[in-house]
Amino acid sequence: TITEETTGFFALGSGPARALSRVEDLFKELNYADQGPNTALVIEGDKAPPAAVIENIAKHCGINPKGLSILYATTWSLAGTVQIAARVLEVAMHKAHALHFALENIIDGTATTPIAPPFPDFVKAMGRTNDAIIYGGRAHLFVKGTDAEAKRLAEGLPSSTCASFGKPFAEIFADVNG
């Protein structure tokens, strides 16, 4: 999550800048860091980030702002739905992590999902993109380890194991955020 109080800027970010900045606990937990003078970030937000946000992102990445490439797209645009769909493998990896499967035992992975049609309402657009991943996404992880560990992952990974499976994401979001 990217926020800036003065301007009220709020957005979600994905891309290699996350690993370079290491602001998320996950990267510390995994003891993973990237290094380099350049990076990129895709922002899911309704407007371009202000200069202060760009400078702050570059600072956290330890790079000159000129080495930072930022793309942004609204959730309700075609570009937004495409970049959200591109996260389907990340969703599978997050679930594997939540299941306490050793991420170093995931050798490779591939995933596909339908691209949700754009919709002009933020909550409905977010719902459609997440529903596409939850109900239409398919991930294939190549793992090493014991048969029992692989079986536990295979049985726990599908979204159908979630108690709210079958409920549209927009309804789940409304229930949580009122």
UniProtKB/Swiss-Prot annotation:
Tell me the route in metabolism or biology where this protein functions: One-carbon metabolism; formaldehyde degradation; formate from formaldehyde (H(4)MPT route): step 3/5
- Tell where it localizes: Cytoplasm
> Catalyzes what?
5,10-methenyl-5,6,7,8-tetrahydromethanopterin + H2O = N(5)-formyl-5,6,7,8-tetrahydromethanopterin + H(+)
Gene Ontology MF terms in the entry: methenyltetrahydromethanopterin cyclohydrolase activity
Coiled-coil region(s)? none
Q: Which family does it belong to?
A: Belongs to the MCH family.
Q: What is this protein called?
A: Methenyltetrahydromethanopterin cyclohydrolase
Organism from which the protein derives:
Hyphomicrobium methylovorum
UniProt gene name:
mch
